[in-house]
Design a protein with these regions (language model features):
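Accessory beta-strand-rich segments of carbohydrate-active enzymes
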Residues: 1-86, 111-112, 256-269
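Surface beta-strand/loop "capping" patches
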Residues: 81-113, 203-211
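N-terminal carbohydrate-binding accessory modules
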Residues: 172-251, 269
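Beta-strand-rich binding/interaction modules
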Residues: 99-140, 147-151
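Short glycine/proline/serine/threonine-rich loop/turn segments at secondary-structure transition edges
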Residues: 39-43, 115, 155-170
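Short strand-edge motifs at loop-to-beta-strand transitions and within beta-strands
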Residues: 29-33, 145-153
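Conserved aromatic beta-strand anchor motif in extracellular beta-sandwich/beta-rich domains
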Residues: 14-18, 120-126, 175
Length: 270
């Protein structure tokens, strides 16, 4: 069982049933605490103690409203004792900008006192829910340890992601223990390729212009800065306001956003 704090500023102590669980001071990144050993049957007490200033405040002292407290969602979640801890996806294009290159790395964690033999698999589905890539591999995870599993696939004539046509594929990562599926994680995947390279056009100094390319096409950035701020709730920004901001950006032909000066809430990227 994990306690997940999406964001709190600036120094955070967590206590369960009067026992200190841990400390975090990275205000704009999530903090997770494994809390099993602090819990008891029945009702439990959870206390989060927040300090306005911490040793991390020097790095976080940027030009914005300095508001302290819980700034994002806080929730509990549970996973099997042997579970998918993390994963990383690379989804880009080859030099033709037509074919997809897919790479998946999965970290499996084992919180038991004995080694575990599990199976990790994935499926990549297109918009019609057709499987376009799949794979599976056995995974031996040592007691109280972690193991990485990697997959690669090449996809011909993928539906690429662009701002105008944001085609997405659905990735399903599964974990089986003893032949039984214990975990399935869904994730959206888009195939696109970013490059910064010189063009054939020369500037007045005789040197070629250097441009940003997405899927082989030069892109002119029309961007804005955005802060995580709400006139009614301070630094807590609900999903409805995020969507409203994106709608306004689209209406004004904005195609890029600079996040000032920190990672945004996970929902912002999704």
């Amino acid at each position: 069982i994990f306690l997940h704090l999406e964001g709190a500023k600036s120094g955070v102590y967590v206590y369960i049933n009067g026992q200190e669980v841990g400390y975090s001071e990275d205000s704009k990144n999530p903090a997770e605490f494994l809390i099993n050993k602090y819990l008891k049957p029945g009702k439990n007490s959870l206390v989060v103690k927040i300090f306005r200033w911490s040793t991390g405040s020097y790095l976080e002292c940027q030009d914005f409203w300095r508001i302290s407290g819980i700034e994002r969602d806080v929730f509990l979640f549970s996973q099997p004792k042997t579970h998918i801890k993390d994963f990383n996806v690379v989804s880009t294009l080859d030099d033709t900008y037509k074919n997809g290159i897919f790479k998946l790395n999965v970290d499996v964690a084992n919180h038991t006192t004995a080694g575990k033999d599990v199976n990790v698999s994935y499926e990549l589905l297109d918009a019609a829910k057709k499987v376009v890539a799949e794979g599976n591999a056995p995974c031996n995870v040592t007691a109280d340890g972690q193991q990485n599993i990697s997959f690669e696939a090449a996809l011909n004539n993928v539906k690429t992601w662009t701002s105008e046509q944001p085609n997405l594929y659905k990735l399903l990562i599964s974990l089986k223990d003893g032949g039984k599926t214990t975990e399935i994680i869904p994730y959206n995947v888009g195939f696109r390729r970013f490059e910064i390279k010189p063009t054939d056009q020369l500037a007045e100094n005789g040197k070629p212009y250097v441009c940003l390319f997405i899927n082989g096409q030069p892109i002119k950035l029309k961007g804005v800065n955005i802060h995580e701020h709400n006139p009614e709730t301070g630094h807590y920004v609900p999903e409805e306001l995020m969507r409203k901001d994106f709608t306004l950006m689209k209406q004004h032909n904005i195609n890029s956003v600079r996040l000032c000066h920190y990672p945004q809430d996970r929902k912002f990227y999704e």
